[in-house]
Amino acid sequence: QPLPDQKERKKEFNTEIDIQALLKQLNDLTGMQSVKTEINNMINLLKICKIRQENGLQTPPVTNHMVFLGNPGTGKTTVARILAKIYHGLGVLSKGHLVEVDRSGLVAGYMGQTSEKVTEVIEKAKGGILFIDEAYALANGQQGDFGQEAIDILNKAMEDNRDDLIVIAAGYHDEMQDFLDANPGLRSRFNRTIEFPNYDAAELLEIMTNRAKSLDYTLTDDAVQYVQDTFTRILACPPENFGNARSVRNYLDRVIHNQANRLITENNFKEEDLTKLTLADVQSETLE
């Protein structure tokens, strides 16, 4: 029995996927209110399209490829991973997995290898989302570079596999314009752009305290105040390599190491001290 043509795949709600739980997971993420609104709107459209289809009505064509614009550590990959599962639950994708690549995962150094590499990645991503981080790097190569070849193959694959593949191209705002201009068809393929704002000081603090809590740690009041003041100061003039939530997670990891060293050195601690991150712990580290 031959497999049905991909475009004939019947798209039905996957009742085993708890879409409401996934939406809660999305909406519980710190900050990014505009992102959540945009994605909830997209999902509402897909739900209605599905119901119209079930009632024998015409459904408007929906292109699901997207561009995510924003700095590192603003939640782009996290949102893409949740989105893949939601789209699987809605029947838009047959598997709902996420394949994450950057330029090195698509571009090879010799003639003919790039085509093989891109095709292999596309095959692996079918049924899910292909997330291309720093996609603009594909368009930034020198003459004779194979980045353009990767873009051209990708452009065709997005159209050929649009029934069961979503491509999300992610990166900084300005550089991504070069990527979208690298092939005449790209802008029409990526007809939805979502901007991920940087976190403010209160949101970074929430990310840190939530992560600490998930690891059975709490920050003392003076540690919380110190961290909030530090975030406020850093954001007033952020260093070039500041990674938003990524920097906060790395900072917390180092603070936890400080606490371990402090407790072992003091050698006189109670069980409750194992969960406390103090002012001394957070002051010993710089946020990078």
Mark where each language-model region is.
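N-terminal accessory segments that target, anchor, or regulate ATP-driven/P-loop NTPase machines
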Residues: 1-14, 62, 162, 166, ...
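C-terminal helical "lid" subdomain and adjoining coupling/linker elements of P-loop NTPases
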Residues: 11, 18, 28, 219, ...
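Pre-Walker A (pre-P-loop) alpha-helix and adjacent loop at the N terminus of AAA/AAA+ ATPase modules
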Residues: 21-64
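Walker A/P-loop
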Residues: 58-96, 123, 190
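Conserved C-terminal "switch" segment of AAA+ ATPases
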Residues: 90-95, 175-181, 187-188, 196-241, ...
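Short glycine-rich substrate-engagement loop in P-loop NTPases that contacts/grips substrate
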Residues: 96-125
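Flexible beta-alpha connector loops of hexameric P-loop NTPases
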Residues: 103-114, 137-148, 193-195
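Conserved catalytic/switch belt of AAA+ P-loop NTPases
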Residues: 136-168, 174, 181-185
